[in-house]
Amino acid sequence: MTSPGPSALRTCISGGAALPVEVLRGLEEAFGVPVLEGYGLPETSPVASFNHPGRERKPGSIGTPIRDVRMRVVDGEDHEVPQGEVGEIVIRGPNVMRGYWQRPEATAEALRDGWFHTGDLARVDSGGYYYIVDRKKDLIIRGGYNIYPREIEEVLYEHPAVAEAAVIGLPHPALGEEVGAAVALKPGAVITADELRDYVKGQVAAYKYPRHVWILGALPKGPTGKIVKRDIVIPANLTAP
């Protein structure tokens, strides 16, 4: 941080990827200003919801829909799910695209009955605040159990040695998928993969903790700084069922 320095800050805004609550708290402690998290996609030009200034702010939430925008959480049949249950976010409003250029099939899949299907899984609370659970395509199904990688990543980020974490599904001959976690450590941190595995094991349900943890120098990222899970280097002994 250079001149004029933190004293000039009033608010920080986060978007583009789900912000771990532990990181949000660390930012607020370091800079002494609130971090307001929002949500949107290129198809929603690009904001759909926000933790609005002057309203209640809920860490870990993407807030409530912006003006003239409607959001719902639906199941696979596009029926709205009960409050607190997980489903896919769908969005309707003047900010939603008309379609993908020269991609009619993709447009028909994403836009149904005027609602844009985001591919993001979330839940909504009694106050209408939305909470991202994970990307639909990142869901891990282990022996019939649904596991949301972000839940495990949040636990890893709470460990003082962890700088970056990404949880992915690995092929398994009997279970279909097994839970794996790639981790990058903070400078100077010393901890083993087994110790990290046991740390998570003590905080989540038995079927959720990553059986495989490996430590990398850094996790791959795209141009915007998001971790790119498909580019994560996986140990050779874990890549085949």
Describe each region flagged by the PLM:
Residues 36, 213-216:
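General small-molecule cofactor/ligand-binding pocket signal
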Residues 93, 98-99, 106-109, 121-208, ...:
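AMP-binding/adenylate-forming catalytic core of the ANL superfamily
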Residues 1-85, 94, 108-111, 174, ...:
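Conserved adenylate-forming
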Residues 234-241:
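Acidic/polar alpha-helix N-cap and adjacent early helical turns
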Residues 11-14, 167, 214-215:
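Hydrophobic/anchoring residues in structured secondary elements
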